[in-house]
């Protein structure tokens, strides 16, 4: 009986990966819920509405990369409600920027 328990502990220890693969987690950039869409926007109106918004051309891995991807196109990183016709009426600054 003890050997079965010992063998199962060894098997489960060997099954655990030794190294985690790097992940791209866009959900950490923008909060879940209403403001969950990462966008690069050209115009900021009083910190609430954003105009000429587009999805980032690359998938950012963190807040600094998100900011830099948008800055390459002369735009600002934002977390928005689902945009309609390029107009994101409700946006906020991403977490970590």
From Swiss-Prot:
Stated family: Belongs to the cerato-ulmin hydrophobin family.
Localization of this protein: Secreted; Secreted, Cell wall; Vacuole; Cytoplasmic vesicle
PANTHER family, A to Z: HYDROPHOBIN
Domain of life: Eukaryota
Task performed by this protein: Aerial growth, conidiation, and dispersal of filamentous fungi in the environment rely upon a capability of their secreting small amphipathic proteins called hydrophobins (HPBs) with low sequence identity. Class I can self-assemble into an outermost layer of rodlet bundles on aerial cell surfaces, conferring cellular hydrophobicity that supports fungal growth, development and dispersal; whereas Class II form highly ordered films at water-air interfaces through intermolecular interactions but contribute nothing to the rodlet structure.
Keywords attached to this entry: Cell wall, Cytoplasmic vesicle, Disulfide bond, Secreted, Signal, Vacuole
Signal peptide residues on this chain, from the entry's feature table: 1-15
Pfam families to which the protein is assigned, alphabetical: Hydrophobin_2
Disulfide-linked positions: 30-79, 40-53, 80-91
Swiss-Prot/TrEMBL induction comment: Under normal conditions on SDAY medium (Sabouraud dextrose agar plus 1% yeast extract), hyd2A is up-regulated at transcriptional level during the first five days of incubation. Hyd1A is the most active at transcription level under normal culture conditions, followed by hyd1B, hyd1E, hyd2A and hyd2C in order.
Highest classification ranks of the organism: Eukaryota, Fungi, Dikarya, Ascomycota, Pezizomycotina
Protein name (database record): Class II hydrophobin A
SUPFAM superfamilies noted in UniProt: Hydrophobin II, HfbII
Organism from which the protein derives: Beauveria bassiana (strain ARSEF 2860)
GO cellular component, one term: extracellular region
Phenotype reported upon loss of the gene: Compromises aerial conidiation and submerged blastospore production. Does not affect radial growth and multiple stress responses.
